[in-house]
């Protein structure tokens, strides 16, 4: 199997130096190169261009992509979060760009696999997605009505938002107990990270089994990188130390 080109390796090294981005190189049990690219879903235009060049160097790509038609409230969350990203891009005057995931999905060459497709969505993720939708459904009106926040008729909304805010303090405990099957009950939002980490790792294994000869890049949110790497290492993958890219020395005059 052909290795990733030196040019693509150098671009990946450049991605790893971008703020809030990460690149982890792994070797699958059969010796295949797999690069995990962790990104922010909204980024500076220059960062987006670098990530695009990195992804274009692969003919096999896997992406994080919440399955809206399978997840409770997915039909609400997807459009709302997408609208927020688009609004940020517009308000930045073109200085911000969207996710590399969308770039990968739109590439005409090669294969892009949505890794989170599954026959059965775990219950924890269903509850977590519904809970996130509840946060969005209450927080957005609260922000829009902020100028009238002192009005008595808004008191129930204020109480609900504060209650949800207090419950966020349970996230660290839920994350610490993430390996327990009941850990997500403490704070369902943790499943947006942990349960999806597991789905992503399983999707990567399926993708490599279906396409057994090509190196691959996997694009996920930056927060998913540690959990996905941990799960792949448990499946026999090996983490590769990043190569040092040496540039020619500049001769002084």
Tell me what each language-model feature is.
Residues 1-253:
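Compositional signal for N-terminal targeting/processing segments
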